[in-house]
């Protein structure tokens, strides 16, 4: 069994924010793969389905980003999951737009959603880091992630969300390198190759 967690803030005010790309991804995973209707559970919204013959719960915490760990802990305890069973999809400013990297454990690079999850369940869960780019200076980061994607960005955002959802079964099977590869090649084929910049996070 796997728990897929999309990070974001609840409500229409935030739904187009860069910080909410995790919500966008799990919404598309549930839609594309015919998961059950969303319902209120675990201090958030949850849906359930099957990927790669494995039961998968997708969760969108309704606790706001800074308290995401409360919802994740509820689900982990209910299903008696290990950290390795948890996959968190989140925005990553230290990656260029449209770039995706998967990592296990490590630093949180100031991401309050990850900080909360690590405080509640430990640090050795898997993270799917969805590049949204950096505004250039630290002082602009808060506004950058809490602003909507620009109109000019929407085409690559839609392509990335679709591509990640399409290949989500590889994450269930813990084939993280294959997942990264598939997403990269698919985005290239769609004309949205990342800029090749190396990530700055451990």
UniProtKB/Swiss-Prot annotation:
Q: Mention any Pfam family matching this sequence.
A: Pept_tRNA_hydro
The UniProt entry's GO biological process terms, in alphabetical order, are: protein quality control for misfolded or incompletely synthesized proteins; rescue of stalled ribosome
Task: Read off the InterPro entries from this record.
Answer: Pept_tRNA_hydro, Pept_tRNA_hydro_CS, Pept_tRNA_hydro_sf
| UniProt-annotated site: Stabilizes the basic form of H active site to accept a proton, residues | 91
Q: Where is this site: Discriminates between blocked and unblocked aminoacyl-tRNA?
A: 9
Q: Which Gene Ontology CC terms are recorded? A: cytoplasm
Example GO molecular function: tRNA binding
What is annotated as the active site? Answer: 19
Q: What is its EC number?
A: 3.1.1.29
Listed binding positions for tRNA are: 14, 64, 66, 112
Which keywords label this protein?
Cytoplasm, Hydrolase, RNA-binding, tRNA-binding
Q: Which domain of life is it from?
A: Bacteria
Q: Which reactions does this protein catalyse?
A: an N-acyl-L-alpha-aminoacyl-tRNA + H2O = an N-acyl-L-amino acid + a tRNA + H(+)
Indicate where this protein resides in the cell. Answer: Cytoplasm
Where the protein is mainly located, per its record? cytoplasm
| Family as reported in the entry's similarity comment | Belongs to the PTH family.
Task: Outline what the protein does.
Answer: Hydrolyzes ribosome-free peptidyl-tRNAs (with 1 or more amino acids incorporated), which drop off the ribosome during protein synthesis, or as a result of ribosome stalling.
Outline the subunit composition.
Answer: Monomer.
Full protein name: Peptidyl-tRNA hydrolase
Q: Please name the taxonomic classification of the source.
A: Bacteria, Pseudomonadati, Pseudomonadota, Alphaproteobacteria, Hyphomicrobiales
Coding gene? pth
């Amino acid at each position: 069994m796997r728990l897929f967690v999309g990070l974001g803030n609840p409500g229409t005010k935030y739904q187009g924010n860069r910080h909410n790309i995790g919500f966008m991804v799990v919404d598309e995973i549930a839609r594309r793969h015919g998961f059950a209707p969303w319902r209120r559970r675990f201090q958030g919204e949850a849906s359930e389905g099957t990927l790669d013959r494995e039961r998968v719960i997708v969760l969108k915490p309704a606790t706001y980003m800074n308290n995401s760990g409360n919802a994740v802990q509820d689900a982990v305890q209910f299903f008696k999951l290990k950290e390795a069973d948890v996959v968190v999809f989140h925005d990553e400013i230290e990656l260029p737009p449209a770039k995706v990297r998967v990592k296990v454990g490590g630093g949180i690079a100031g991401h309050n959603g990850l900080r909360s999850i690590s405080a509640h369940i430990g640090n050795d869960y898997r993270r799917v880091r969805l590049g949204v780019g950096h505004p250039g200076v630290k002082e602009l980061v808060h506004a950058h992630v809490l602003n909507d994607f620009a109109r000019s960005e929407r085409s690559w955002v839609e392509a990335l969300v679709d591509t990640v959802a399409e290949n989500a079964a590889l994450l269930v099977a813990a084939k993280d390198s294959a997942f990264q590869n598939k997403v990269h090649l698919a985005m290239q084929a769609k004309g949205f190759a990342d800029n090749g910049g190396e990530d700055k996070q451990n």
